Amino acid sequence: MSVIISKDNFKIIQYDNHIFTIEFASPCPALIHSLVNTKLILGATTTNDYQTVKFKAHTVKTLLQYQGEKTSPSIKTAHLLTSQLVTQLQYLLHENSTILGYHPENIIVINDQTFAFLGAEYVTHIYDEQIFISYPFSHADFFVSPELLKIKDLPSYVHYKTAYFSLACLVVYTLLGNHDFYDKYLQTHSSALDIMQNLDHHTIKHTKVYWLLSRSFIAEPEKRTILFI
Protein backbone atom coordinates (compact mmCIF):
# COMPACT_ATOMS: atom_id res chain seq x y z
CA MET A 1 0.00 0.00 0.00
CA SER A 2 1.28 3.48 -0.85
CA VAL A 3 -0.11 7.01 -1.00
CA ILE A 4 0.41 8.15 -4.60
CA ILE A 5 -1.41 11.51 -4.45
CA SER A 6 -1.89 13.60 -1.31
CA LYS A 7 -3.81 16.90 -1.23
CA ASP A 8 -5.34 18.94 1.58
CA ASN A 9 -8.79 17.42 1.16
CA PHE A 10 -8.18 14.03 -0.44
CA LYS A 11 -5.54 11.37 -0.95
CA ILE A 12 -5.28 8.41 -3.29
CA ILE A 13 -3.88 5.12 -2.04
CA GLN A 14 -2.67 2.28 -4.27
CA TYR A 15 -2.97 -1.32 -3.09
CA ASP A 16 -2.00 -4.64 -4.68
CA ASN A 17 -3.96 -6.06 -7.64
CA HIS A 18 -4.55 -2.62 -9.18
CA ILE A 19 -6.88 -1.51 -6.37
CA PHE A 20 -7.07 2.21 -5.56
CA THR A 21 -9.01 4.22 -3.01
CA ILE A 22 -9.85 7.91 -2.94
CA GLU A 23 -10.09 9.02 0.69
CA PHE A 24 -11.68 12.40 1.36
CA ALA A 25 -10.98 14.43 4.50
CA SER A 26 -14.70 14.79 5.23
CA PRO A 27 -17.97 13.32 3.91
CA CYS A 28 -18.94 14.57 0.44
CA PRO A 29 -22.05 12.68 -0.75
CA ALA A 30 -22.83 14.91 -3.76
CA LEU A 31 -19.30 14.66 -5.17
CA ILE A 32 -19.05 10.92 -4.56
CA HIS A 33 -22.44 10.35 -6.20
CA SER A 34 -21.20 12.32 -9.22
CA LEU A 35 -18.35 9.81 -9.56
CA VAL A 36 -20.26 6.60 -8.87
CA ASN A 37 -23.84 7.15 -10.06
CA THR A 38 -22.73 8.54 -13.42
CA LYS A 39 -20.37 5.56 -13.84
CA LEU A 40 -17.63 8.09 -14.49
CA ILE A 41 -15.32 5.76 -12.56
CA LEU A 42 -16.38 2.32 -13.80
CA GLY A 43 -16.94 -0.29 -11.10
CA ALA A 44 -16.41 2.20 -8.28
CA THR A 45 -17.95 1.56 -4.87
CA THR A 46 -18.25 3.83 -1.87
CA THR A 47 -18.36 3.46 1.90
CA ASN A 48 -21.47 4.33 3.91
CA ASP A 49 -19.80 7.40 5.41
CA TYR A 50 -19.26 8.91 1.93
CA GLN A 51 -15.55 9.46 2.54
CA THR A 52 -13.97 6.67 0.47
CA VAL A 53 -14.30 5.49 -3.14
CA LYS A 54 -12.74 2.18 -4.20
CA PHE A 55 -12.00 1.14 -7.78
CA LYS A 56 -9.62 -0.84 -10.02
CA ALA A 57 -7.23 0.81 -12.46
CA HIS A 58 -3.78 0.57 -13.99
CA THR A 59 -2.72 4.19 -13.46
CA VAL A 60 -3.97 7.22 -11.55
CA LYS A 61 -2.38 10.67 -11.71
CA THR A 62 -3.33 14.33 -11.49
CA LEU A 63 -4.07 16.29 -14.65
CA LEU A 64 -0.95 18.35 -13.93
CA GLN A 65 1.17 15.18 -13.93
CA TYR A 66 -0.60 13.87 -17.02
CA GLN A 67 0.00 17.07 -18.97
CA GLY A 68 3.65 17.08 -17.89
CA GLU A 69 4.15 13.64 -19.44
CA LYS A 70 2.71 14.59 -22.82
CA THR A 71 4.97 15.88 -25.58
CA SER A 72 2.24 18.11 -27.02
CA PRO A 73 -1.37 19.11 -26.24
CA SER A 74 -4.05 16.82 -27.64
CA ILE A 75 -7.50 17.63 -29.03
CA LYS A 76 -8.59 14.09 -28.12
CA THR A 77 -7.60 14.72 -24.50
CA ALA A 78 -9.52 18.01 -24.45
CA HIS A 79 -12.58 16.32 -25.94
CA LEU A 80 -12.56 13.49 -23.37
CA LEU A 81 -11.93 15.83 -20.45
CA THR A 82 -14.69 18.20 -21.55
CA SER A 83 -17.26 15.45 -22.08
CA GLN A 84 -16.59 13.74 -18.76
CA LEU A 85 -16.32 16.85 -16.59
CA VAL A 86 -19.50 18.28 -18.14
CA THR A 87 -21.29 15.01 -17.27
CA GLN A 88 -20.03 15.25 -13.69
CA LEU A 89 -20.98 18.92 -13.36
CA GLN A 90 -24.45 18.35 -14.82
CA TYR A 91 -25.03 15.62 -12.23
CA LEU A 92 -24.05 18.02 -9.45
CA LEU A 93 -26.34 20.70 -10.87
CA HIS A 94 -29.21 18.20 -10.83
CA GLU A 95 -28.42 17.73 -7.13
CA ASN A 96 -28.58 21.52 -6.65
CA SER A 97 -24.80 21.76 -6.18
CA THR A 98 -22.01 23.22 -8.26
CA ILE A 99 -18.25 23.71 -8.33
CA LEU A 100 -16.58 26.97 -7.35
CA GLY A 101 -13.54 26.41 -9.54
CA TYR A 102 -11.29 23.92 -11.34
CA HIS A 103 -7.52 23.43 -11.16
CA PRO A 104 -5.27 20.79 -12.79
CA GLU A 105 -4.32 19.53 -9.32
CA ASN A 106 -7.90 18.65 -8.35
CA ILE A 107 -8.55 16.64 -11.52
CA ILE A 108 -7.41 13.02 -11.62
CA VAL A 109 -6.74 10.98 -14.75
CA ILE A 110 -7.48 7.25 -14.58
CA ASN A 111 -5.84 4.95 -17.15
CA ASP A 112 -5.02 8.04 -19.24
CA GLN A 113 -8.64 8.22 -20.42
CA THR A 114 -10.99 9.07 -17.54
CA PHE A 115 -11.03 12.57 -16.03
CA ALA A 116 -12.72 13.31 -12.70
CA PHE A 117 -12.95 16.35 -10.42
CA LEU A 118 -12.08 15.63 -6.76
CA GLY A 119 -11.91 19.10 -5.18
CA ALA A 120 -14.53 18.48 -2.49
CA GLU A 121 -13.75 21.79 -0.77
CA TYR A 122 -14.99 23.62 -3.87
CA VAL A 123 -18.34 21.82 -4.16
CA THR A 124 -21.05 24.15 -2.90
CA HIS A 125 -24.84 24.33 -2.65
CA ILE A 126 -26.95 26.51 -4.95
CA TYR A 127 -29.46 28.95 -3.41
CA ASP A 128 -31.83 30.62 -5.90
CA GLU A 129 -29.20 30.35 -8.67
CA GLN A 130 -26.55 31.87 -6.37
CA ILE A 131 -23.68 30.40 -4.39
CA PHE A 132 -22.50 31.76 -1.05
CA ILE A 133 -18.84 32.82 -0.79
CA SER A 134 -17.83 33.01 2.86
CA TYR A 135 -14.05 32.58 2.83
CA PRO A 136 -11.13 34.19 0.99
CA PHE A 137 -9.40 32.32 -1.81
CA SER A 138 -6.30 32.79 -3.93
CA HIS A 139 -6.29 33.22 -7.70
CA ALA A 140 -3.87 30.28 -7.67
CA ASP A 141 -6.41 27.96 -6.01
CA PHE A 142 -8.40 27.48 -9.23
CA PHE A 143 -9.29 29.22 -12.48
CA VAL A 144 -11.25 32.25 -11.28
CA SER A 145 -14.22 33.76 -13.13
CA PRO A 146 -14.60 37.54 -13.70
CA GLU A 147 -17.41 37.79 -11.14
CA LEU A 148 -15.23 36.17 -8.47
CA LEU A 149 -12.42 38.59 -9.29
CA LYS A 150 -14.80 41.47 -8.54
CA ILE A 151 -15.60 40.36 -5.00
CA LYS A 152 -14.43 42.99 -2.52
CA ASP A 153 -16.22 41.97 0.66
CA LEU A 154 -17.09 38.69 2.34
CA PRO A 155 -19.53 37.10 2.66
CA SER A 156 -20.83 37.53 -0.88
CA TYR A 157 -22.93 35.80 -3.55
CA VAL A 158 -22.17 34.96 -7.20
CA HIS A 159 -24.14 33.16 -9.90
CA TYR A 160 -23.74 29.37 -9.89
CA LYS A 161 -22.55 29.42 -13.51
CA THR A 162 -19.20 30.75 -12.31
CA ALA A 163 -18.23 27.06 -12.66
CA TYR A 164 -18.74 27.17 -16.43
CA PHE A 165 -16.08 29.85 -16.89
CA SER A 166 -13.59 27.98 -14.71
CA LEU A 167 -14.19 24.70 -16.55
CA ALA A 168 -13.67 26.48 -19.88
CA CYS A 169 -10.30 27.78 -18.61
CA LEU A 170 -9.32 24.23 -17.66
CA VAL A 171 -10.16 23.05 -21.18
CA VAL A 172 -8.06 25.84 -22.73
CA TYR A 173 -5.19 24.89 -20.40
CA THR A 174 -5.48 21.31 -21.69
CA LEU A 175 -5.49 22.48 -25.31
CA LEU A 176 -2.56 24.89 -25.02
CA GLY A 177 -0.47 22.91 -22.54
CA ASN A 178 0.11 25.95 -20.31
CA HIS A 179 -1.74 28.61 -18.33
CA ASP A 180 -0.09 31.69 -19.84
CA PHE A 181 -3.50 32.83 -21.10
CA TYR A 182 -4.81 32.76 -17.51
CA ASP A 183 -1.84 34.71 -16.12
CA LYS A 184 -2.47 37.39 -18.76
CA TYR A 185 -6.18 37.43 -17.91
CA LEU A 186 -5.36 38.02 -14.22
CA GLN A 187 -2.78 40.71 -14.94
CA THR A 188 -4.76 42.69 -17.50
CA HIS A 189 -8.36 41.77 -16.56
CA SER A 190 -8.77 40.88 -20.21
CA SER A 191 -12.16 39.72 -21.38
CA ALA A 192 -13.39 36.23 -22.12
CA LEU A 193 -13.25 37.19 -25.79
CA ASP A 194 -9.50 37.75 -25.40
CA ILE A 195 -9.13 34.23 -24.01
CA MET A 196 -11.00 32.79 -26.99
CA GLN A 197 -8.59 34.59 -29.32
CA ASN A 198 -5.87 32.21 -28.10
CA LEU A 199 -7.71 29.55 -30.10
CA ASP A 200 -8.25 31.52 -33.32
CA HIS A 201 -5.54 29.58 -35.16
CA HIS A 202 -6.03 26.31 -33.28
CA THR A 203 -7.40 23.23 -35.01
CA ILE A 204 -10.07 23.02 -32.29
CA LYS A 205 -11.96 25.85 -33.97
CA HIS A 206 -15.55 25.01 -35.01
CA THR A 207 -15.56 21.71 -33.09
CA LYS A 208 -17.92 20.75 -30.24
CA VAL A 209 -15.28 21.76 -27.72
CA TYR A 210 -14.82 25.16 -29.37
CA TRP A 211 -18.55 25.93 -29.29
CA LEU A 212 -18.80 24.88 -25.66
CA LEU A 213 -15.99 27.29 -24.84
CA SER A 214 -17.69 30.10 -26.73
CA ARG A 215 -20.89 29.52 -24.70
CA SER A 216 -18.95 29.42 -21.42
CA PHE A 217 -16.69 32.43 -21.96
CA ILE A 218 -19.50 34.97 -21.65
CA ALA A 219 -19.12 37.95 -19.30
CA GLU A 220 -22.67 37.71 -17.92
CA PRO A 221 -22.71 34.42 -15.97
CA GLU A 222 -26.46 33.88 -16.28
CA LYS A 223 -26.07 33.69 -20.09
CA ARG A 224 -23.48 30.89 -20.02
CA THR A 225 -24.34 27.32 -21.03
CA ILE A 226 -22.38 24.06 -21.10
CA LEU A 227 -24.05 22.32 -24.01
CA PHE A 228 -21.68 19.74 -25.47
CA ILE A 229 -23.34 18.84 -28.76
Regions from the PLM with identified roles:
Residues 166-178:
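Short, conserved alpha-helix in the C-lobe of eukaryotic-like protein kinase catalytic domains
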